[in-house]
Amino acid sequence: MAITNSLTDSDYGINSTTGTSSTTGSSSQDLQNSFLTLLVAQLKNQD
């Protein structure tokens, strides 16, 4: 199943227009969790 990523972290196969779960090694739940983790970290670090 092809997925489109919207984050910018190469560890999750991101910053490419298309990817598959087999090439990224991440499920959609993993991507959602990593996005939320990055979002919370960014919110905590803003001035």
UniProtKB/Swiss-Prot annotation:
Q: Which InterPro entries match?
A: FlgD (IPR005648)
Annotated segments matching region Disordered: 1-30
Classification via Pfam families: FlgD
**Which superkingdom?**
Bacteria
Question: What role is this protein assigned?
Answer: Required for flagellar hook formation. May act as a scaffolding protein.
Keywords, in A-Z order:
Bacterial flagellum biogenesis
- Transmembrane helix listed as a keyword: no
Its BP terms in the Gene Ontology are: bacterial-type flagellum organization
Instruction: Supply the source organism's classification.
Output: Bacteria, Pseudomonadati, Pseudomonadota, Gammaproteobacteria, Enterobacterales
Please give the name of this protein: Basal-body rod modification protein FlgD
Name the residue ranges with Low complexity bias: 16-28
Family assignment from sequence similarity: Belongs to the FlgD family.
**Signal peptide positions on this chain:** none
